[in-house]
């Protein structure tokens, strides 16, 4: 039997591999989300200027 078993049942190497994939996927998602917000802001800003929406 193993001395150190994990709750999830995955090995340390598998956990590190999953973590690397998760982090890179999350960073890709964040890049897409930030780009979408920048494009939406350029199209139609959601905070009015000093003179309001006019």
Swiss-Prot record:
TM region(s), chain numbering: 21-43
Topology term for the membrane: Single-pass type II membrane protein
A GO MF label: bacteriochlorophyll binding
UniProt keyword list: Antenna complex, Bacteriochlorophyll, Cell inner membrane, Cell membrane, Chlorophyll, Chromophore, Light-harvesting polypeptide, Magnesium, Membrane, Metal-binding, Transmembrane, Transmembrane helix
Protein name as catalogued: Light-harvesting protein B-880 beta chain
Cytoplasmic side: 1-20
Species, as recorded: Rhodoblastus acidophilus (Rhodopseudomonas acidophila)
Main location per the UniProt record: membrane
Residues reported to bind a bacteriochlorophyll: 19, 37
């Amino acid at each position: 039997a193993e001395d150190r078993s994990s709750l999830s049942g995955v090995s340390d190497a598998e956990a590190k591999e999953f973590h690397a994939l998760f982090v890179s996927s999350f960073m890709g998602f964040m890049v897409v989300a930030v780009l979408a917000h920048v494009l939406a802001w350029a199209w139609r800003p959601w905070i009015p200027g000093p003179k309001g929406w006019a």
